[in-house]
């Protein structure tokens, strides 16, 4: 294998690794996938180093090494991308495809989004159902549904316009709190606090916290701390949005 061909393989592997990192894959899965691709494509070994904003990858073959670095731009979590890459890896391992196949397949990968109106409806229903389980009356149930559905729509629109995630969470929390406060200001519900609390549940950054814990537990401390800080910042942004809405409406708390 000459140096030029090894360079192409290195760039293809790191492209797959960056895609997985951008869409929320666990760090150990990214490393294992890169190593499997390297072996399947004919290099002796693959070494990878990850931080939240970049990946450094080196391929070794007969005492010849190629190193490359790529920046990671975080995007909304999408496990369909991760699954597609895993399928490509399995196909290369089983059928001995070359790097051209890998590059072609990576170009074909597109996020598999659900219908946006279905997402809006299901998020609203999930938050409203949680409110009902916590003992809300039917008025609070429907207000929670309206508030969280509208908030999800706002979140989608802001994401489509490529707003920073922190700003998106803050504005979404503000919107949800403003709408759900109808149950408290007009006295039409006996359980307004439940509606206020339940309407912002769509903003809980659970995936970031779970991944941060798993990464830290498995030795990827930099990735773990980075994802933990991301979750903390999103939580703070959500809290600021709620506080601003409550201050405007002079609501004293849940």
Across the structure, where does each feature detected by a protein language model lie?
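Soluble N-terminal domains of membrane-associated systems
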Residues: 1-97
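C-terminal ends of transmembrane helices
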Residues: 105, 149-162, 208-223
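Core alpha-helical transmembrane segments of integral membrane proteins
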Residues: 113-186, 190
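Alpha-helical transmembrane segments and their cytosolic membrane-interface
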Residues: 74-140, 230-239, 250
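Generic detector of multi-pass transmembrane helix bundles and their immediately adjacent loops
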Residues: 185-254
């Amino acid at each position: 294998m000459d140096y030029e061909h090894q360079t192409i393989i290195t760039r293809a592997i790191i492209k797959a690794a960056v895609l997985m990192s951008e869409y929320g894959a666990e760090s150990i899965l990214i490393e294992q996938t890169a190593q499997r691709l390297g072996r399947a494509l004919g290099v002796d070994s693959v070494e990878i180093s990850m931080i939240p904003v970049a990946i450094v990858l080196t391929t070794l073959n007969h005492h010849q090494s190629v190193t490359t670095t790529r920046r990671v731009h975080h995007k909304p979590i999408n496990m369909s991308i991760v699954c597609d890459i895993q399928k490509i890896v399995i196909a290369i391992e089983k059928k001995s495809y070359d790097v051209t196949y890998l590059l072609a397949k990576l170009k074909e990968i597109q996020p598999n989004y659900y219908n946006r109106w279905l997402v809006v409806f299901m998020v609203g229903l999930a938050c409203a159902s949680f409110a009902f389980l916590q003992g809300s009356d039917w008025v609070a149930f429907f207000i929670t549904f309206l508030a969280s559905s509208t908030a999800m729509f706002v979140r989608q629109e802001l994401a489509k316009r490529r707003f920073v995630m922190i700003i998106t969470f803050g504005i979404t929390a503000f919107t949800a709190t403003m709408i759900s406060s109808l149950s408290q200001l007009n006295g039409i519900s006996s359980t307004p606090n439940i509606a206020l609390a339940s309407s912002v549940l769509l903003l809980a950054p659970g995936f970031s916290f779970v991944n941060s814990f798993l990464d830290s537990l498995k030795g990827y401390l930099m990735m773990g701390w980075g994802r933990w800080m991301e979750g903390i910042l999103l939580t703070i942004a959500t809290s600021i949005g709620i506080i601003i809405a409550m201050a405007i409406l002079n609501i004293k708390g849940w």
